[in-house]
Amino acid sequence: SYVEINNFYTMTVYEKGSEVVRMYQTLFGRDGFRKGMDLYFKRHDGHAVTCDDFRHAMADANGRDLAQFERWYSQAGTPRVSVRTAYDAAARRYTVTLAQGYGDASPAARETQQGPLLIPFAIGLIGRDGRDLPLRLDGEAAAAGTTRVLDFTDTEQTFTFVDVPEQPLPSLLRNFSSPVIVEYDYSDDDLAFLLAHDSDP
């Protein structure tokens, strides 16, 4: 039973809830999100529903298993994503390693943690001339755009971009693609360069 109904109506609940819903659009794009909404209303219009009902509609409309995504609703605390990068000039490969955790989470928050989250992590790579570089992940036939949403699902995961012509500067968590705290060792010069050139507002 619920002890205090006010727990459901705090600013944290509203703000986190809206960010979780926005992540569906980040994962599936506007068209995929619209398909999920259409299916949700077709199934549940006029009914009392749950967050699981909404998640199932998004999953079914887009043909994707979102069981891991449920942890956003049940795990307390703000995730931290630490980022490490390395560039191999000879191979023209740029690796990005992401690690997720909760840092100094309270004991109560740690008790709710069931495993890694599905984190949509948007990234771009900026060349020395300040322009976005085309992005192609290892195994892909061709580059696809200049911003890529990485499906970050493990405690630690490495993504490799290929055909990267120069040492880039990463533009991380573009469009605030998920409500996480990013940890990356930017220098002051790096931050000034991003301020001057990053296409992500």
Question: Which role fits each region the language model picked out?
Answer:
Residues 35-36:
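Surface-exposed patches in mature extracellular/periplasmic domains of secreted proteins
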Residues 1-19, 23:
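Acidic/His/Gly-enriched intrinsically disordered linker/tail segments
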Residues 12, 17-20, 31-32, 42-201:
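Non-catalytic accessory/interaction domains
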Residues 25-27:
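Acidic, glycine-rich low-complexity/disordered segments
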